[in-house]
Amino acid sequence: MTLLSAEENAHVTSLWGKVDVEKVGGEALGRLLVVYPWTQRFFESFGDLSSPSAVMGNPKVKAHGKKVLSAFSEGLHHLDNLKGTFAQLSELHCDKLHVDPQNFTLLGNVLVVVLAEHFGNAFSPAVQAAFQKVVAGVANALAHKYH
């Protein structure tokens, strides 16, 4: 459960309504794979990940980034039950894909960087603080099956 104040909730809701999920999702996943190259091992089937430009231009990275951010977006509607919302994804990533749960935190932090880049001054420290709470809550929910 992620508890946001009314003001924090308003920050998240207002900004998220302006997010291009496809663009931001692709960029966030791409940056994760570039900045933390060991995460690429989970995406070997995506083809060319040999350079930053190859990763950022890879259509499979963009498509999966959209899928990831669409799931994140769904979670924003269930902040009071993130563990339930992400239970199946947590189980998949834990039992089948064997993803290091720390990667969820890394992706959340990369998402915050991408949002800051896209929204500039509108992504104020207060907005960032609200999003940091949300991405931490989502990362915790996705890591739930690991405990």
Curated annotation (Swiss-Prot):
Disulfide-bonded cysteines: none
Ligand binding (heme b): 64, 93
Residues with PTM Phosphoserine: 45
Pfam families: Globin
Tissue spec: Red blood cells.
Residue positions, PTM Phosphothreonine: 13
Domain of life (superkingdom): Eukaryota
Subunit relationships: Heterotetramer of two alpha chains and two beta chains.
InterPro entries: Globin, Globin-like_sf, Globin/Proto, Hemoglobin_b, Hemoglobin_oxygen_transport
Name under which the protein is recorded: Hemoglobin subunit beta
Record's keyword annotation contains Acetylation: yes
Location of the Globin domain: 3-147
CDD domains in the record: Hb-beta-like
A Gene Ontology term for the protein's cellular component: hemoglobin complex
Alphabetical GO biological process terms: hydrogen peroxide catabolic process
Keyword list, A-Z: Acetylation, Heme, Iron, Metal-binding, Oxygen transport, Phosphoprotein, S-nitrosylation, Transport
Role, per record: Involved in oxygen transport from the lung to the various peripheral tissues.
Modified sites of kind N6-acetyllysine: 60, 83, 145
A molecular function GO annotation: oxygen carrier activity
Keyword Transport among UniProt keywords: yes
Similarity-based family: Belongs to the globin family.
S-nitrosocysteine PTM positions: 94
